């Protein structure tokens, strides 16, 4: 079922939104937690999505466990990034997103390099899933179409789309293998008015 939570203030945190909790459905006991601020430092970026704020810095909106790789894929809308962590250790495996604003050591170690044309990064994504072949599919909200304020798209030029990426985890490359389009033109682009 659907569960809508209310954010609450905690003594040492602004909200409860930046922690993933694994719960035993039989007993209700907490089995494991992953604190996003330990995986991805809160202040490691110089640019965030246009919708981010100090109290809503990650905005997790999808969690996907991949049994083949024993990893968890998380969608951080306000990071404009999809991250993947090792299930057992919580170590960061990779980051899918535009590298602008990230420290160079993160870009070199965790980000993918595009090798296909056309190619577009996603912005403020939702509905991230890992396909059986390892591809990553998502709904790209397309807000601002950039992480850099000076390059933000005007509202009339922003669009949303479905997109599928093929990632090579070893070579650290990424290809855009599907975009919701017909005859070379997007046919399901939701424009902001």
Where do the model's predicted regions map?
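Histidine-/acidic-rich catalytic cores in large beta-rich domains
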Residues: 1-193
């Amino acid at each position: 079922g659907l569960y809508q939570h209310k954010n609450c203030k905690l003594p040492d945190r602004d909200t409860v939104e930046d922690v993933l909790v694994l719960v035993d459905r039989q007993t209700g006991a907490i089995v494991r937690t992953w604190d996003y601020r330990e995986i991805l430092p809160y202040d490691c970026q110089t640019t965030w999505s246009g919708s981010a704020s100090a109290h809503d810095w990650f905005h997790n909106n999808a969690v996907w466990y991949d049994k083949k790789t024993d990893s968890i894929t998380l969608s951080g809308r306000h990071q404009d990034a999809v991250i993947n962590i090792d299930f057992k250790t919580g170590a960061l495996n990779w980051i899918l997103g535009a590298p602008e604003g990230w420290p160079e050591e993160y870009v070199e170690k965790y980000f993918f390099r595009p090798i296909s044309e056309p190619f577009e990064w996603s912005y403020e994504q939702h509905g991230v899933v890992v396909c059986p072949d390892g591809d990553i599919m998502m709904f790209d909200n397309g807000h601002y179409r950039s992480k850099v304020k000076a390059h933000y798209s005007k509202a009339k030029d922003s669009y949303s789309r479905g997109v599928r990426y093929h990632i090579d985890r070893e070579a650290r490359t990424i290809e855009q293998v599907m975009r919701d389009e017909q005859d070379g033109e997007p046919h399901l682009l939701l424009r902001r008015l």
